[in-house]
Amino acid sequence: MGDNTSGFENEDELIEYLNNKKIKELNNNMREFIFFIFGNIDEESIIQAESGKSGQKPDMIITINNVIKRISIKKGTGNSVHQEKVEIFAEFLTSINIPSEIIDKLLKYHWGDGTNNGTGSERISSTEYKKKFQNDIDIINEEFNKEKNIKEFINRFIMQGKSEEYDVVDALYYGNVKEGHWASKDEIIEYVVNNIFSLDSIHFGPLTYQIWNRCLNFNPKTENRRKVMQVKWGSLLNDLLIIERNRKNE
């Protein structure tokens, strides 16, 4: 699936390709995707496609016969699916009843300077932190990967984002116009909840937590990035292939 277009260009190409076409005019890949998300509909139906709302999880909104489906689009490797200030994320953790001692351990991992607020004078890398405090990371992971919490994280990172007022993703599409892999919201949740992901870093199922920039050299130009957490889905394509295989075997 070699492709040099950027993520935004790819989204634009998908929208432009789909918009105002009849289903029967699509290539086999896109026809299959449309039938997946809309079910068995008339091939004479005309597709309306547009960009999702700025800052929200759906990248593309598809409407056919007044039925709306919201799609998150991904491509390439090392897919970053979410980022926000760590202080906002900590407030979210409190709101879903993550114990305060777990939040404290997460903040100490995030800042890597012996404090839970980033004021320490010595900073260490994620690798060094794991060498010293792997037990704390394991405790965090045990809590984060409980089913009730995983569902909250998947909703925040992939499906809806930071506000309950935001639109919710119906399906995730990985690829371009010519070739793609996909899964519905329910398939993704079921896959993440029902599988064990053994990682030595902080994770939420197959999604991994990282700091945008630990700023180990105290560079004032990147200091603000130290305040931001990111979530990546490095195994996205492989996980979608597994979901597709499971779907075909049902």
Model-based region annotation:
Residues M1-P58, I62-K69, K74-E250:
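Short, positively charged
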